[in-house]
Amino acid sequence: MDRKESFQIDISTGYYCKGESILLGGAMLDGECVPDCYVKIPLKTMNRHGLIAGATGTGKTKTLQIIAEQLSENGVPVLLMDLKGDLSGLAQPGEEKDFIIERHKKLGFPYKAKAMPVELMTISNEKGVRLRATVTEFGPVMLSKLLDLNDVQSGVISLIFKYCDDHKLPLIDLKDFKKILQYSIKEGKEVIGAEYGNISSSTVNTIIRKIIELEQQGAEDFFGEPSFDMEDLLRIDKQGNGFISIIRLTDMQDRPKLFSTFMLSMLAEIYASFPEQGDSPKPKLVIFIDEAHLVFRESSQVLTDQIEAIVKLIRSKGVGIYFCTQNPTDVPETILGQLGLKVQHALRAFTAKDRKEIKQTAENYPISKFYRTDEILTSLGIGEALITALNEKGIPTPLAATYLRAPMTRMDILVPDEMDVLLNNSELIDIYEDTIDADSAYEILKEKIEAAGKKDHQEKIRKETNTIHRRRSEKSTFETISQNTMVRQVGRTLARELVRGFLGVLGVSTTTKRRKRKY
């Protein structure tokens, strides 16, 4: 048996699929496409996560497009996080250009152009379905990360969330959160301090300044209601194609912390809301995270551990996560080891550090008797990639240098008129377009404080009126004895009782307790 026949048997056996699969392209040997030697990925293993990596301009985005459109065609909804703004073309069919026809001639199957059902989404002022979350849903850990707080400040955030949970104060937007922070060091200082521990005014003021800074970056557009229902990511069109939801994040390039925290929050929400699914013929949802290095670059070790835990557990919910980045080393090893599909485009070696990273990358792939992995990594052309995946039994497939098929959809962006048509036909735009300003912590606390202030003011007027109508002789007597120490003490007691009356309206306990540690 010659080398080529041996290669054909290895690839055909390794990538054989009984069930549904997606076709990425044809396997190559010595730089040439081998006939009838296809690289297929079983749909049932697409919830085992994956990586698409490679230098700029080598075709990562087109590979993402190829996988996403075939998932959609097989009835699997897809969520794409688009930081570069070049994925909207999925909504339009591709064009049968000469180079595409020639590519498919080499592959041995005809090119097919097809548009996919696409929903454009946004967390900012870009056009699209508005994605929002309440501050409560975001949670104290994510919010602390977003605000870049230290441990002491994060502790205060957790305390405030606990207080709001216990007292049924909805935290919907940043306005609510600023209000409860101000309340914690003013009108509600004693009740919160007595029950949960005292809070330093300087710490709270620092947190409020950071929230204002966040608002200036446009974060107030993200927090609010109606919050997005994750079930709306799972829609199927009338033809049985899964919707491709594209979150437009082009204006997030200079705000990686907001993007990464949003992404982590969304993954956590999906994990919490989706039921257990176990092994199934195909995934319920597949998520692609473009520019993944931004996520991990901004993550503390604690948050990286959380991502690792989510990646490990979320596949039981039928969800696959795919990271797209320039270099596999951008993804922590603990997460890299959990990724079933690896698509590696060419890497460029300009420095000694680059060459070292290429050798390190080569070690992450199965040993092949047909390739020198570290050498082929630098010689792959545009639209070519090294691929290894998991077969239907969960066993790693042989390493295959693959000549990738062309996307069925447009390899360019939508023009403004096409985008407007797409948005006008959206079933979700009207549901999420307008912000709902329901009664929440801001309104509840404001009403509470105003009511307490009004009652205190009325009490003050009543006492002043009684004093004016006293007889002059009584007033003189009071003036005479007011210098007495006992009388002054009685006066202080009366004042303290009035304060208790005022604080009682606010629900504030004035019982003296042991002083608790300040945060």
Predicted segments, located by residue:
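P-loop NTPase motor domains
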Residues: 68-78, 85-309, 335, 377-380, ...
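Long amphipathic alpha-helical segments used for membrane anchoring, targeting, substrate engagement
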Residues: 459-519
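Conserved ATP-driven motor cores of ASCE-family P-loop NTPases powering translocation/secretion/packaging/pilus
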Residues: 2, 66-68, 91-107, 309-395
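Conserved P-loop NTPase motor module
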Residues: 1-14, 28, 130-136, 343, ...
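Phosphate-binding P-loop
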Residues: 32-35, 39-47, 239-240, 279
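N-terminal pre-Walker A segment at the start of P-loop NTPase domains
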Residues: 13-38
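The conserved Walker
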Residues: 52-56, 299, 328
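Conserved lysine of the Walker
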Residues: 60
